[in-house]
Amino acid sequence: MSSVLNKDYDVIIIGGGVTGAGTARDCAMRGLRVLLVEKYDFSNGATGRNHGLLHSGARYAVTDPESASECIKENMILRRIAHHCIEATDGLFITLPEDDIQYQKTFVESCQEAGISANIISPEEARRIEPSVNPDLIGAVRVPDASVDPFHLTTANILDARRHGADILTYQQVVGLVLNNGRVEGVRLRNNHTGEENEVHCRIVINAAGIWGHDIVKMADVKINMFPAKGTLLIFGHRVNNMVINRCRKPANADILVPDDAVCVIGTTSDRVSYDTIDNLKITQEEVDVLIKEGEKLAPSLATTRILRAYAGVRPLVAADNDPSGRSISRGIICLDHEKRDGLAGLITITGGKMMTYRLMAEVATDLACKKLDIEAVCQT
């Protein structure tokens, strides 16, 4: 810590999830002097509490085409640069008897418009390539979904950021922003083991703290209208499916089953929660029951598969309407230049998006930081 206190950084990044880690890597690869701070350990927030799905973007093709297009582009990039974190499972979007088979046509057309490979296959072929799938399905579409380990992905970004010169601190919580004449010039950190507090200075702060980013900007009397959407998931005791299985319908609860190493994960729910609960999420029996009931419709053998555990995360969505679930809010990237937006120089917030688009989020945030620092350096990630 003493070596950090004696440095002046170009950029301090708040948040040790995959977005913060990716931003640290991008900044460091462009030659910036970088410090990343995380209040607990890496992947403690939304990064470590999701499906582990490498989206093809197909899920959003009908309802959020911009996000779908971002997903498939990043899907292809991550398969190349982070193949050691990915299992190329492919995915099925299945239509069940209670679903509208006409939606399949809209779905495939929307995928094609977004640049996503989506091939209709027969129910017989779907059962052949994925024996666990509901045998009553009446339609299926094959897409390039995959499984990704978010913990390995985050750690890989952290290690490469460090290799390029970034400093990394965990268990250092930002408890204040250093403000001077309408400008952010650093952060005040508290060691969550010892309670010791110190100031570290920089030219730009990048707020990549996910849903907790709301608390960061409040330290400068700035507001982001974020929508904390809780998502609950279940891990089952063994791997039921070898391909990702989705329902071919608009996004809803418990409509994705993801194979993950020796287990599988079903999810997710989506419910708005209050900010005072995001650090102490409670999983309800009703949520578990919904996940089991709907999950069995994807793969009936889940009915007799042991549940290992339930967990929940909070999506860092930016509120755009009165949707109580957050399903209709775009999963697109939000990059806020607080100098333009709020008259507060030296602060950038990168939020929204998904784990899937972390690399692009990092690129967008780093591009803006470099512009403000008058540094000409192109993205190398």
Per-region residue spans from a language model:
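Flavin (FAD/FMN) cofactor-binding and adjacent substrate-gating region
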Residues: 94-164, 169-170, 177-183, 261, ...
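N-terminal Rossmann-like FAD-binding beta1-loop-alpha1 element of flavoenzymes
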Residues: 11-35
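Dinucleotide-binding Rossmann-like beta1-alpha1 core, especially the glycine-rich loop
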Residues: 51-125, 129, 254-255
